[in-house]
A protein has these predicted regions:
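Extracellular glycan-modifying ectodomains
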Residues: 1-185
Length: 185
C-alpha cells in the first residue's frame, strides 16, 4: 500500500524532473492489521498473516484538504487520517478519508501556482499524500463517483498536470471505462 505508492511517486518525480523525498524524511504511523479489498471479497481464511497498514505523513506542515462527502457537502478532511478505529478491511480510509468524488488539497508552503489533478479510484489514495509536497493545489477525482468533465476542470482551475492512478482491473469493467470516457471527452 504505502510503500508501493511511494515507488510510484518516485517514478512520477523522475518523469517530472523533481527530487522525491526519501522515505526516511516522512513521519510514519502504523494503524494496525489490514486486509485488502480483493482478499476480503474472497471470504478467505482470516487467520493468515495480515499486512499492517502504515501511512507516511507529508513533509510539509501547511497542508489542508476539503472534500465532497456523500451528501454533496464540502467538508474539511485530512490527507492522512487515523484509521486505527476502523475494521481490518477499512484501514484504507487513512488515505484521503476514503473514496470521495472530489477533493482539493492545498499546500500553503508552496507559493507558486503549481497544480495537478489526480484521476483515480481507491488504489490512487495512498499515492496522493506524497504528491502534496510538490504542488500548491491538487485536485483529486474519483471517477467512479464524480460527474464532471475533466476538460472543464482543467481549464477552470488552470491545472498543469494530469495523473491517472488506477488498478488494472478497471480495464475489464465496461461501466467504469465508459464513465471515465464520458468525463474525459
Amino acid at each position: 500500500t504505502s510503500k508501493g505508492a511511494y515507488y510510484g511517486y518516485v517514478g512520477i518525480c523522475e518523469k517530472l524532473g523533481i527530487s522525491p523525498h526519501a522515505l526516511s524524511e516522512y513521519e510514519k504511523k502504523k494503524f494496525g492489521s489490514f486486509i485488502g479489498t480483493y482478499y476480503g471479497d474472497t471470504n478467505g481464511d482470516k487467520n493468515f498473516r495480515k499486512d499492517e497498514l502504515a501511512a507516511y505523513y507529508p513533509v510539509s506542515d501547511k497542508i489542508s484538504m476539503k472534500y465532497q462527502n456523500e451528501s454533496g457537502k464540502i467538508v474539511n478532511g485530512h490527507v492522512i487520517a487515523d484509521s486505527s478505529k476502523y475494521g481490518i478491511s477499512n484501514k484504507y480510509l487513512a488515505f484521503l478519508e476514503g473514496d470521495n468524488a472530489y477533493t482539493v488539497i492545498t499546500n500553503k508552503n508552496i507559493k507558486d501556482s503549481s497544480s495537478c489533478v489526480v484521476v483515480k479510484e481507491s488504489f490512487g489514495n495512498a499515492l496522493v499524500p506524497y504528491l502534496t509536497d510538490h504542488f500548491s493545489k491538487i485536485y483529486v477525482i474519483d471517477y467512479r463517483y464524480w460527474n464532471g468533465k475533466l476538460s472543464h476542470l482543467v481549464k477552470d482551475k488552470k491545472i498543469q498536470k494530469i495523473f491517472f492512478i488506477n488498478n488494472i482491473s478497471m480495464t475489464r469493467n465496461s461501466y467504469l471505462v465508459g464513465k471515465l470516457n464520458q468525463q474525459i471527452r
